Design a protein with these regions (language model features):
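A short, exposed helix-loop element centered on a Lys and neighboring polar residues
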Residues: 57-58, 104
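Conserved NAD(P)H cofactor-binding loop of Rossmann-fold oxidoreductase domains
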Residues: 25-30
């Protein structure tokens, strides 16, 4: 897996002449309580969410360090330790907060080199396939916002000066207000 990711990053950098932005959007989700979460699913969520974010960022960083306005953007929640975020989905919360911890640590680690590392999270559900297929079907999609709000918010973050805007945990509509 690591070799495949490195090859993909290198191929992309070769094709486009470098890497300016790394968006860690891939995610595995299962909103089950502790007793309902099997370890295979727990491992999958942590491998994709936390480990995948760390590894993808790590492999992109040599290219980002050469870019003019380099950004890493993780789609992960603010580091809010309120137990309500963990109560019914401990495994998923651990995996997503792992992505957020990458923001906290990498933002500080690469601040002096000018690589911005930030997080973006939606205030409410976004109408995606995951929401439809896993979180509640068509009824949930009907009351969800469209993905464009996240795209617009990501654009705002990724066009900011990387030397000045790093280590932030942004909520989509706050950023666009």
């Amino acid at each position: 897996f690591e070799d495949q990711l490195e090859a993909a990053v290198n191929k992309g950098a070769d094709h486009f002449g470098g890497i300016d932005i790394c968006v860690n959007n891939a995610s595995a989700i299962q909103l089950t309580n502790t007793l309902q979460t099997d370890m295979k699913r727990y491992d999958l969520m942590n491998q994709i969410n936390a480990r995948g974010t760390f590894l993808t960022s790590k492999k992109c960083l040599p290219f980002l360090l050469k870019a003019e306005n380099p950004h890493i953007l993780n789609l992960s929640p603010p580091l809010d330790m309120n137990p309500k975020w963990f109560a019914n989905s401990v495994a998923y919360s651990i995996a997503k907060f792992g992505m957020s911890l990458c923001v906290l640590g990498m933002a500080e680690e690469f601040k002096e080199q000018g690589v911005a590392v930030n997080a973006l999270w939606p205030r409410t559900a976004i109408a995606t396939a995951a929401v439809k297929n896993i979180l509640g079907g068509d009824e949930t999609v009907k009351v969800s916002r469209t993905p464009e709000i996240m795209a617009d918010a990501a654009y705002v973050i990724l066009t900011k000066d990387s030397k000045e805007f790093t280590g932030n945990f942004c909520i989509d509509d706050n950023l666009l207000a």
